[in-house]
């Protein structure tokens, strides 16, 4: 019949079930068995006050959150979807004017859907950004220092023995430092200290 809305199926289920009882049925994504029928009379808490853990917002005609699903997802088609809790990996608020970070996640991720993506919470970059830029060492200085350290260890450890030579007192390294430069490298008129010229 023309003008009557067609009910939609839930996505990602091996046996799709139709969510009935609403004028505009919503879709629950990723659940094997949808627990809550959004916007229907069955989704409201019973009048006797029996608690229903699958209803997130009690006494609400349109509960938005699903509890107890193996991998809870955001309910699509809501004006302001809420974050689904009781999930190992909480989802980020999607299609919201003001998205918020995941709730209860040990590693929160970047807030998506905003004009300016925020810094990942709990990352090293976020800690450096909060610190004073004058007191924090520059990135180039740290990289240069690391490169010098790596290049030094590479040059010293390139010998077959693996250890760098240590100059001894009176050894050939010390004698080589005390020897004068060859005659063809001396500047004209330079004093020759080894011959007693001043």
From Swiss-Prot:
Keyword Phosphoprotein: yes
Record flagged with keyword Nucleus: yes
GO CC entries: nucleolus
Organism, scientific name: Homo sapiens (Human)
Protein name: Ras-related protein Rab-34, isoform NARR
Modification after translation: Phosphorylated during M-phase.
Region feature 13 x 9 AA approximate tandem-repeats of P-R-V-I-V-G-(S/T)-P-R, mapped onto this chain: 7-125
Sequence repeats: 7-15, 16-24, 25-33, 34-42, 43-51, 52-60, 61-69, 70-78, 79-87, 88-96, 97-105, 106-114, 115-123
Localization, UniProt: Nucleus; Nucleus, Nucleolus
Compositionally biased residues, Basic and acidic residues: 145-157
Residues with Phosphoserine modification: 13, 78, 87, 96, 123
Subunit comment: May interact with EIF5A and ERF1.
Residues annotated with Phosphothreonine modification: 69
Sequence segments annotated as region (Disordered): 37-64, 94-198
Amino acid composition bias (Low complexity), ranges on this chain: 94-121, 161-178
UniProt main location, coarse: nucleus
Coiled coil stretches, renumbered: none
Keywords: Nucleus, Phosphoprotein, Repeat
